[in-house]
Design a protein with these regions (language model features):
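Membrane-proximal soluble regions of multi-pass membrane proteins
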Residues: 22-25, 29-40, 271-317
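"…together with the soluble PPM/PP2C metallo-phosphatase catalytic core" -> "…together
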Residues: 2-274
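Short, highly charged low-complexity linear segments
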Residues: 136-138, 234-238, 261-264, 283-292, ...
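Juxtamembrane boundary at the C-terminal end of a transmembrane helix
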Residues: 328-336
Length: 336
């Protein structure tokens, strides 16, 4: 019956996100036009360039996922009522993972609104953005500590699980770094949804392998929502997830493993995001030190564009990287 709950969560996530996408595309287009002070569509000269692809599509993911997780968890509890009073605090872990993911998504919404209002792609200033991301990470860690679910160590290849006192600080830094890395992936058609979809499938499998099968309703619901969102975000995109979708996906990849005590799994699962963000970090550091760029373009998807790769091939390439990260995560889980 719990398998039925996972299927129900995935199907409902797909259906709700697909329905919301049909509604959100025209609404977000009008919102962007209004906030930027543009003229109505019929008054725009037809010779002018087409309007930019609407962003903030991550709101579809957030709403669809929340409803689907609720339905999936109710189905799981109906099949196994002991989940409500489990000594492993299944419900507390699920709620904390949801809250943390939505907290990062809310930071992304604020970032997207700042992008629209300022007529630039820069969004929020770095200091307040990092402060909000750090607050979201601290919220997750604090709630886990209060509920007695905060992991006190980490899994290392060849050594297994070892206790590590500064682990909470490491996990907080990891969540913020992952959010920043995922943020720069926005703009590449379909890649955020495609890579996050692979990561969610991996988390479903890993939670089953590690004994957290009921909590797989969250990645199942988000996987269904991401698959539906690809109907609009697959190249050529008609709707982008925006910063809110990127940070929402990053929050899920970071918070779900953390809440089951295996935060280190988010490192390989987010491999494409680390490459995107790491390339930007190297570009900035090298330019400040040498006065010239290290790469012809950054992040990774821009570099691939510069080399003449099509948007569809970039999508497939980054999804392949995500599959490689999933394979590494499976290998890491075997040491647990």
């Amino acid at each position: 019956m719990i398998r039925f709950a996972l299927i129900a969560a995935s199907v409902q996530g797909f259906a709700l996100t697909a329905a919301l996408g049909n509604l959100m595309v025209p609404l977000l287009r009008e919102l962007q036009r209004t906030m930027r002070g543009a003229q109505p569509e019929q008054e725009i000269d037809r010779k002018e360039p087409e309007e930019p692809v609407p962003t903030i599509g991550g709101l579809c993911l957030m709403v669809g996922t929340l409803a689907a997780v609720g339905a999936g968890w109710l189905a799981a509890c109906a099949a196994q009522p002991s989940l409500l009073g489990s000594d492993r605090q299944m419900m507390s872990r699920l709620l904390i993972a949801l809250l943390g993911t939505f907290a990062f998504g809310a930071v992304g919404v604020a970032d997207d609104l700042a992008c629209i209002r300022s007529r630039s792609a820069l969004g929020m200033r770095r200091a307040p953005r990092l402060a909000l991301e750090a607050a979201a990470a601290a919220l997750v860690l604090g709630l886990l500590a209060l509920s007695g679910c905060l992991p006190a160590g980490l899994v290392l290849p060849g050594a297994g699980y070892i206790r590590f006192a500064p682990a909470p600080l490491l996990w907080g830094a990891l969540l913020v770094a992952l959010a920043e890395a995922a943020r720069v992936a926005d703009g590449a058609d379909g890649t955020v949804c495609g890579t996050a979809f692979v990561a969610m499938l991996g988390l479903m499998m890993l939670e089953t392998q590690l004994g957290w099968f009921p909590l797989a309703v969250f990645p199942a619901a988000l996987a269904g929502a991401l698959m539906a969102f690809l109907l609009w975000d697959f190249p050529p995109a008609k709707l982008h997830p925006g910063k809110c979708g990127c940070l929402f996906a990053a929050g899920a990849i970071g918070c779900i493993p953390l809440c089951i005590g295996y935060a280190e799994l988010s490192v390989p699962l987010a491999l494409p995001f680390w490459l995107e963000g790491g390339m930007v970090a190297l570009q900035i550091l090298f330019y400040r030190r040498r006065g010239r760029p290290l790469f012809a373009a950054a992040p990774l998807h821009r570099w691939l564009e510069k080399r003449g790769m099509s948007a569809v091939n970039i999508f497939y390439s980054l999804c392949a990287l995500s599959v490689c990260g999933l394979a590494l995560a499976v290998c890491l889980a075997r040491w647990a």
